[in-house]
C-alpha cells in the first residue's frame, strides 16, 4: 500500500472562524499541492479526512485537483489530531484492496503515524509542514518497516506545480 500523509493547510483563527477552516492562503497552498501531485501522476483509491473542517477542506481540494470524486472521501475520527497511531494504522489495515490512500490529517497524529510505520516506537521524527506531503510504502499492516519514499515541503510542491 502507498500511504500518503498530508497535514491540512493553514487555517483561520478561531475568532474569525469558530470551526477553524482553511484560510485563503491555506486553500491556495492545498490547491498548489494538489496540482503538484497530479503533475507527478499520483492518484488515490481512497482519501481519509477527520471530521474537522480544515481536514475535510484539504481532502476535498486534493480530490478536486487529482480527479478523485469528493463524494468518496471517507470522514473518520480515526485520523484526528490526538488519535493514537495504532488506531489510524488499524483503520488502514481494514481497507483491503486499496493500494493508494491519502490521509488529510493533523499533528501530532500524522507524525506519529509516520513514525509508527517506519520504526518501532516513536524514534523516527518525521516533521510535517501544512500542505506538505509524504509517501510511505508498506507491504502489510500493521508494520514498523515501511519505506519512506519521499517527503515534499509546500515550497517543493509549488515548484513542481509551476
Locate each region found by the language model.
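A polyampholytic, Gly/Pro-enriched intrinsically disordered region
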Residues: 91-102, 146-154
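Domain-level recognition of soluble alpha/beta enzyme cores
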Residues: 118-147, 153-154
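Short, well-ordered coil/turn elements that cap or connect secondary structure elements
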Residues: 68-70, 98, 143
Amino acid at each position: 500500500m502507498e500511504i500518503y500523509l498530508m497535514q491540512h493547510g493553514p487555517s483561520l483563527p478561531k475568532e474569525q472562524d469558530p470551526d477553524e477552516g482553511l484560510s485563503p492562503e491555506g486553500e491556495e497552498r492545498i490547491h498548489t499541492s494538489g496540482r503538484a501531485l497530479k503533475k507527478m501522476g499520483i492518484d488515490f483509491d481512497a482519501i481519509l479526512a477527520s471530521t474537522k473542517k480544515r481536514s475535510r477542506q484539504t481532502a476535498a481540494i486534493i480530490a478536486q485537483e487529482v480527479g478523485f470524486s469528493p463524494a468518496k472521501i471517507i470522514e473518520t475520527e480515526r485520523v484526528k489530531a490526538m488519535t493514537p497511531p495504532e488506531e489510524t494504522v488499524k483503520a488502514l489495515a481494514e481497507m483491503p484492496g486499496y493500494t493508494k490512500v491519502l490521509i488529510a490529517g493533523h499533528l501530532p497524529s500524522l507524525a506519529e503515524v509516520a513514525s509508527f510505520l517506519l520504526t518501532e516506537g516513536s524514534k523516527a521524527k518525521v516533521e510535517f509542514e501544512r500542505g506538505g506531503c509524504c509517501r510511505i510504502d508498506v507491504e502489510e499492516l500493521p508494520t514498523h518497516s515501511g519505506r519512506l519514499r519521499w517527503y515534499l515541503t509546500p515550497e517543493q510542491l509549488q515548484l513542481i506545480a509551476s
